[in-house]
Amino acid sequence: MDKIILMIFILLSAFGLVMIYSASSYFSLTSVGNSEYFLIRQFAFVVAGIAIAIGIANNGKKFFFNERLLQIVYVILILLLLFVFTQSGIKGAKSWINLRIFNLQPSEFAKVILIWASAFYYQKFKDSKDWKQLYMYPMGMMALVSILVLMQPDFGTVMITVLMMWLLALTTGFSKRAIKYSGVAFVIGYLFTYLPISIIQYLPFKAYQVGRFLSFHNPWDDTSGVGYQSIQGFLALARGGLTGTGLSSSIQKTGFLPEAHTDFILAIVGEELGFIIVWLVLVVLFFLILYIFWKAQFCKSLFSRYLCLGVGIFLLVQSGVNIGALLGLAPITGVPLPFLSYGGSSFIVSSIAIGMVLFALKYDKEYQEEIKNKIRMNEFILEEDEEKEISQEEQLEEVTVQLIDEEEDEHEEITGG
């Protein structure tokens, strides 16, 4: 098991607990009468998440290569995505299932299930010359999930899922033309967010989604409306400066910054601990992502390689979208920051992703050892064959020498006689 990945995962999770408690204490005290409410819940998710990650790392071989199980899990996911439409909406979206203990968000689990499916089918059809066969299953599964999630509506999850699957597909060996067209499509998609307000308001989006687009363009146009959250995030970062105001001394979390303990947790880190700590946190987070990419390039097993690449891309895209929204570089879509933001479904999914990487690296090590053993066995067989050939040659030489000696003896007897 890769200790570096596991240690960084635990370190970020522990830091996340500290910041969730600090960012949520005021809100939880005023809403439920207990300042530790969100801390206790997140602590339970962290303990469960670490256990799940280690469990997957040690037992993944039992189910990751089972295609029937993959299909069953995917069907269950689709049923859950359909079931959410029977639930009451939260903040304008029907994305959660109320389980009494916590709210389950099936669309979050779609990310790791699609990574699993991609790694499985890209490895299965690695020798296929038909690109349709190679991409049919992963892209078809993604398309159905994206349609259902978009209907909730949850544009942020769809954006991350599509971008993640597109980038993972590029690693399978797209042609230069396909890469060029994909790049053009990405640029067009990003420029789409800069459409004039007069056009955006007529597109089939909910009112709050249109508001997020508008605040992304210029939050200062409506400081008390759609631009309010972005501006409060900016103020939190500005107030913290380089060194921060001190842990638990945030003003923005006291009712000014919405979702301070979830989507905008990094703003509170900046306000209380300063830009230097924000920078260190991001360095650790992106070191983890780059380390996963680095380990992926040495994987001999294609399944392990695609699993690592998929998780690395997922963490990179999700982190980028969250940070981009905070800095005003992307629309606010309610995307949490991996390992740091409050949220049961989000943290468990991130834990599953880490478990998948730990398993992939462990399995690849076994896979490489198996290859080495086969090479040694083949070399041993070749050596045995060579020894047999040598022994046969020696026997032939001995017989030849004996025949020569016998002939010489006979010759001596004849001449002597």
Predicted features along the sequence, with ranges:
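Hydrophobic alpha-helical segments of polytopic membrane proteins
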Residues: 69-70, 74-78, 135-148, 155-201
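Hydrophobic alpha-helical transmembrane segments
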Residues: 44-52, 272-292
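N-terminal membrane topogenic signal
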Residues: 1-9
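Hydrophobic, glycine- and aromatic-enriched re-entrant/interface helices and adjoining loop segments
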Residues: 182-277
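Alpha-helical transmembrane segments of multi-pass membrane proteins
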Residues: 11-25
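Short, highly charged, low-complexity non-transmembrane loops/tails of multi-pass membrane proteins
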Residues: 212, 367-405
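Membrane-helix boundary/helix-loop-helix interface segments in multi-pass membrane proteins
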Residues: 3-4, 26-152, 323, 327-333, ...
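Loop-to-helix entry and N-terminal half of a specific, functionally important transmembrane alpha helix
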Residues: 294-333
